[in-house]
Amino acid sequence: MNQQRGFTLLEMMLVLALVAITASVVLFTYGREDVASTRARETAARFTAALELAIDRATLSGQPVGIHFSDSAWRIMVPGKTPSAWRWVPLQEDAADESQNDWDEELSIHLQPFKPDDSNQPQVVILADGQITPFSLLMANAGTGEPLLTLVCSGSWPLDQTLARDTRP
């Protein structure tokens, strides 16, 4: 009698099941980014886009533009004139987009060397020549305090963005 050599269907299915389980464990462990990191990146992208628009506005208008940071949001500010003096006023181009400047509720914001506050003075000023007040903005998980992302401005565009768990070279 001729004996066949090869794998039975049961052996093949067992190997496929083991490979599938191993792959799913690896993807679950390493391939999934937590929600807070994703929101930090999305918020950083929105803030970076707003900062770029503020730089363009300062350059094109020839006037400084400020950015005011509070615990709940950032606001673009421009010089406004009153009868006695000038002061910083929020830029009101589109009130419908005002919510786009809010920080995500799951994020804690740490601004260095300044602190977010409720005054009407910007902590960061962008001059008409493109110079920016140097700052560092750390976004952390509000619940755990775990650092998620850092944006650093050394005085000019572009910002340096670093993820806390960044493993890229």
Swiss-Prot record:
GO cellular component terms, A-Z: plasma membrane; type II protein secretion system complex
More about this protein: Part of a cryptic operon that encodes proteins involved in type II secretion machinery in other organisms, but is not expressed in strain K12.
Induction: Silenced by the DNA-binding protein H-NS under standard growth conditions.
UniProt name for this protein: Type II secretion system protein H
Annotated source species: Escherichia coli (strain K12)
Propeptide: 1-6
Designated gene of the protein: gspH
NCBIfam families noted in UniProt: IV_pilin_GFxxxE (TIGR02532), typeII_sec_gspH (TIGR01708)
Modified residues annotated as N-methylphenylalanine in this record: F7
